From Swiss-Prot:
Source organism (scientific name): Priestia megaterium
EC numbers for this chain: 1.2.1.70
InterPro entries: 4pyrrol_synth_GluRdtase, 4pyrrol_synth_GluRdtase_dimer, 4pyrrol_synth_GluRdtase_N, GluRdtase_CS, GluRdtase_dimer_dom_sf, GluRdtase_N_sf, NAD(P)-bd_dom_sf, Shikm_DH/Glu-tRNA_Rdtase
Misc: During catalysis, the active site Cys acts as a nucleophile attacking the alpha-carbonyl group of tRNA-bound glutamate with the formation of a thioester intermediate between enzyme and glutamate, and the concomitant release of tRNA(Glu). The thioester intermediate is finally reduced by direct hydride transfer from NADPH, to form the product GSA.
Annotated metabolic or biological route of this protein: Porphyrin-containing compound metabolism; protoporphyrin-IX biosynthesis; 5-aminolevulinate from L-glutamyl-tRNA(Glu): step 1/2
PANTHER family in alphabetical order: GLUTAMYL-TRNA REDUCTASE (PTHR43013:SF1)
Name recorded for this polypeptide: Glutamyl-tRNA reductase
Gene that encodes the chain: hemA
Quaternary organization: Homodimer.
Site positions for Important for activity: 99
Assigned keywords, A-Z: NADP, Oxidoreductase, Porphyrin biosynthesis
Record Pfam families: GlutR_dimer, GlutR_N, Shikimate_DH
Swiss-Prot/TrEMBL domain comment: Possesses an unusual extended V-shaped dimeric structure with each monomer consisting of three distinct domains arranged along a curved 'spinal' alpha-helix. The N-terminal catalytic domain specifically recognizes the glutamate moiety of the substrate. The second domain is the NADPH-binding domain, and the third C-terminal domain is responsible for dimerization.
Binding site for substrate: 49-52, 109, 114-116, 120
Lineage: Bacteria, Bacillati, Bacillota, Bacilli, Bacillales
Residues the entry annotates as binding NADP(+): 189-194
Amino acid sequence: MHIIAVGLNFRTAPVEIREKLSFNEQELASAMKTLSGQKSILENIIVSTCNRTEIYAVVDQLHTGRYYVKAFLAEWFGIDKEEFSPYLTIYENDGAIEHLYRVACGLDSMVIGETQILGQVRSSFLLAQEEETIGTVFNQLFKQAVTLAKKAHHETEIGANAVSVSYAAVELAKKIFGDLSSKHVLILGAGKMGQLAVQNLYGSGAKKVTVVNRTFEKAQELANRFSGEAKPFADLQHALSEADILISSTGANDYVVTKQMMSEAERTRKGRPLFMVDIAVPRDLDPELDELETVFLYDIDDLNGIVESNLQERQKAADEIEIMLEAEIVAFKSWLGTLGVVPVISALRQKALTIQAETMKSIDRKLPDLSERERKVLNKHTKSIINQLLRDPIPHAKELAGEKHAEESLELFMKIFNIEQEVALQKEKEEQLHTSITSHSVAYQS
């Protein structure tokens, strides 16, 4: 048995390739069921987002596992393997375990430490449980991965510092004003940066946001999404007189707000300070605005310094999580090692119970006049003898499973107790159970 992770992500594949191998939510369950029916695949979970598509699988052999996962991707999406194979990354066993932990913790994300991926991993895990495409191994592995990720975010500051310019602008405003709920925020520009700024503002408690854009319809569209107010570009002068915070990201070729405009707005502001953040390149806000006593101006270079500092803080937290990862990998491998001993212990118990049952039958034949009470006493004591005899071998078998040469040690253990056949029967039952679960897999879809 082996664990593999096969997939591609924003680092290894351009968006033109990623979009061709992206599962939508509606087909994910069907895809996992289909993959379960393939040769070599014992368990599987698919994690598919805008930045990655990854298949995690428990396989009976590494080479056949890799082959059938690639074949599945090619047939499901109707793409030749040669088209996407150069972009694939394949992790095996320890590498696959570590990769999953890193993904769940946000260490492999475009924005290090982001938490959205944890929700996506958890959703795929719950779906796989519901569709019965996983068993003992992945139930434990993914449960451990989700728990580790939650612990990592709780015990470190991996997600505490802003690492996008628009978010840093809002964080800077919060540091200066504290509570944003009573502040009037003016957003210049309804593009991507403006949208992110509005989203982060509302997430930080801002309640009064006005959007100004050269195309009024775009300003309305953005404002309506967040119950804000839109104003035409012609009303910018009036909007400046009302605002406490200005975040600008129009990307215009000339300054959108000049020192002269702000000087005129100051006549009605009654000395109220205005916090200005320019996240546009080229700059929207005239640098001379900083000469005004009531204006506090920051540009994208100021914010980049904050972001860079925060990235360094996140990296420190990531280094702490890497140490956590090592301990979790050891713990999971230790648990995984005990799986090999389960059929051995079951077979040993079954053989002991069979001997006890045969002994009771022999007693019944030789002592047919025993009372029911006497028979119960004998049955109880013979079972007690069996349990006492197994008290030492079973813990030792578990210890053997965790050793470096576990397979050879367990083989010797089975020979000593003469239970090779019983163990083989136990494993056969497990395989039959897996076959019954996956036999109703659905047909391929493209």
